[in-house]
Amino acid sequence: YISNSFNDKASVLVTNHTLGKKFTFDNLEKMSFLPNWRIEDLLGSIDLFVNFISFQEMEPHIVKNYISHVQRLSPKWVLLRNMREGKQLATDTNVGVEKQITTENYLAYFSNYEFVKSSVLEYGFETIDGYSSELLVLKIKN
């Protein structure tokens, strides 16, 4: 799918071999698609971590654990887009989360980072029912 999606085939190198227990970015090709649990085995550092709209689908303890592994990789910048107020709560008739994760949670969990900017209007989105899809930018503390 990925190879077929890019016109410049020469620039697309996809990691298609099985990686060892622990691995670094040097073991990866330009594009690597790994299951989320493999973040625990990744060694090294990154410049930018991006999460768009998936943290809001998880329970807070899962996000906190994931972020602990992201912080271990010491990205210089973090870019998040999620619902500021959190995902709707699950009910007997509606899907949702058991406990919402909000902007305050992200700021607390990314303890090695400082707030740069938050915006719903620039590149974010406010739904008709008042939920705010927020773009949040953090940078590593000196």
Which residues fall in each region the model found?
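S-adenosyl-L-methionine
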Residues: 2-42
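Flexible loop/turn segments at secondary-structure boundaries
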Residues: 40-41, 57-59, 86-89, 124
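A short beta-strand submotif of the Rossmann-like class I SAM-dependent methyltransferase core
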Residues: 51-54
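A short, conserved alpha-helix within the catalytic core of class I
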Residues: 57-70
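Short, flexible/disordered intra-domain loops and linkers
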Residues: 87-100
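Short, conserved loop/helix-junction motifs that constitute active-site signature segments
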Residues: 43-44, 69-74
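Conserved beta-strand signature within the Rossmann-like core of class I S-adenosyl-L-methionine
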Residues: 74-87
